[in-house]
Amino acid sequence: MQTDTRLQTSNYATKPVTKAPAWHGLVAWDMLLNGMTTGLFLVAALSELVAPDRVAAVAQAAYPVALLLLLVDLLCLVLDLGDPLRFHHMLRVFKPSAPMSLGTWCLTIFAVPLTVAAALSLLPAGGMTLAWVRRLVVVIGLLPALGSAVYKGVLLSTNAQPGWKDARWLGGYLTNSALMLGCAEMLVLSVLMRHVSAAAILRPALGLLLVLNLVPLCLLAVDLRTTLSRLYTRWQLCGVGTLALGGGVLLPLCLLLVVDSPLSMLSAVMCIALGSLVIRFVIIMLPHASA
């Protein structure tokens, strides 16, 4: 009898999950906005700490934008949860071993220094004291911002859903993608503010991050190759690859490195954002396509 019970348990444990989660387009937008707000904060903070003379003005404008993106991201997250109290319920217990719990706490803690940095950035210039206080605040926010950027990829890759469970490089891709998106947003701000010295640093940096982002993206594609080949035809995969790689990497890379104009830089950033959104939609829809 005990042997039969163990056998039944073993057979049940090895069965694939057939019910896809009720996660759709809002989650893809949530993933994109999460990368945009955390990436913008991280790039702005690191830029201000490393090259304050050339980037501080753009970084100061970036913190309120990052806060606005965080609020929109949280709105998407709450709408997707269906019940606003669910987010509050996840804060009742701190469980570092659970990606959902750790990520929720990182996101909540990250909101505090981001809000303070945004508020300080909106105050009139107060000399070196105000600038150093803001830099201290952003240093405090670096670790929770990084945790917020990482956790969604770890959460999905440790899930039992088809496709997600094989995406071992999803956390690495989303983290690197967040830095790339943050650098792209900083470039947009520098162009809009006509800050030439900041744009001169951020443009080649974005090109480098675009190339580096190909490494985790290709490794993620290798993780998902079996699932993708089973779910999509060759032509469908070619279409997704054209949008994600051609439109999201090669075209913006050419616009950044070959054409030197504000319009080309803004167009490159738009292509990067659209390519990133396409990849996130494909990732979110994997369990639905497998069902």
What residue spans do the PLM features occupy?
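Membrane helical hairpin/interfacial module
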Residues: 40-106
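Helix-boundary and loop/linker segments of multi-pass membrane transporters
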Residues: 16-20, 62, 163, 261
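N-terminal signal-anchor module of multipass membrane proteins
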Residues: 1-53, 281, 286-290
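Juxtamembrane membrane-interface segments at transmembrane alpha-helix termini
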Residues: 76, 102, 180, 278-287
